Amino acid sequence: MYAWLNALPKAELHLHLEGSLEPELLFALAERNKVALPWPDVESLRKAYAFNNLQEFLDLYYQGANVLRTEQDFYDLTWAYLRKCKEQNVVHTEPFFDPQTHTDRGIPFETVLSGIGQALEDGRKRLGIGSGLILSFLRHLSEEEAHKTLDQALPFRHAFIAVGLDSSEKGHPPRKFRQVFERARAEGFATVAHAGEEGPPEYIWEALDLLKVKRIDHGVRAAEDPRLLERLIDEQIPLTVCPLSNVKLRVFKDMSEHNILKLLEMGVKVTVNSDDPAYFGGYVTENFVALQESLGMTCEQAERLAQNSLDARLA
């Protein structure tokens, strides 16, 4: 079944580039940039990946991102991910990157963007992988900080297809970023947002009504609100679901409890994605395999999920 699922043409619509930083590359970049790490070797770092919730993961994620310093680093990070896409027949990807994670460390915005952008361009030319980059605001920071990031991005507007919202969800509702999203839309960007992962269904309503998003990232807690489900089905608003991530971060205790196939059968436009694959134990194919092994996903369901991802592209 792995080979068949791997060969299925699919798009990935929920992937954080910084979250695809594998331990081996992290160590190589640390050595290249002479960055001291708190782990003595790759194995120790892998063991540190046994976190229990979103905040513990984010603490590790931001520590790992600290090794990314130069344009070449960002190129190497993105290229490693694109090679994995090629291996798994991901024909199109719309990755997120978090400029604030890097600009707050003194890395120039254009350094980050140049490295990522060049790799995506090479991915199109050399690997045949379509792509569109999404600039994501960090929700644990202020809306004022998000406005500054948008200011930095505007001279490079051609490089992005959308703006998004990620990081710690609890206590940071979408309404906090209403004005910056309004401004981004006025500048011609599509909008997406993480909502309904650890946060309540109300956050999904806010993302739809206040941020006017085209897609909801995660969104699994929509199942708690029948009226919201009805709207998602009626308007065919895609959810970019990340099964392995959800289990690793305890959104579901076990993959056997995941609701993605129930949502699919209800008519919700759900898609399968890897989120932060270096940290969550698998890329897109591994997420499909987990659904097949734990939920008995059929070939027909897998084909529908893959087609949903291709249909839900912004670029």
UniProtKB/Swiss-Prot annotation:
- InterPro entries, alphabetized: A_deaminase_dom (IPR001365), ADE (IPR028892), Ado/ade_deaminase (IPR006330), Metal_Hydrolase (IPR032466)
Report the family membership: Belongs to the metallo-dependent hydrolases superfamily. Adenosine and AMP deaminases family. Adenine deaminase type 2 subfamily.
User: What biological function has been recorded for the protein in this entry?
Assistant: Catalyzes the hydrolytic deamination of adenine to hypoxanthine. Plays an important role in the purine salvage pathway and in nitrogen catabolism.
GO terms (BP aspect): adenine catabolic process; hypoxanthine salvage; nucleotide metabolic process
Q: Which reaction does it catalyse?
A: adenine + H2O + H(+) = hypoxanthine + NH4(+)
Provide the species name: Azotobacter vinelandii (strain DJ / ATCC BAA-1303)
Catalytic activity, EC:
3.5.4.2
Record-given protein name: Adenine deaminase
Q: Which NCBIfam families match?
A: aden_deam, PRK09358.1-6
Instruction: Output the SUPFAM superfamilies linked to this UniProt entry.
Output: Metallo-dependent hydrolases
A GO MF label: adenine deaminase activity
The UniProt site entry described as Important for catalytic activity is assigned to H218
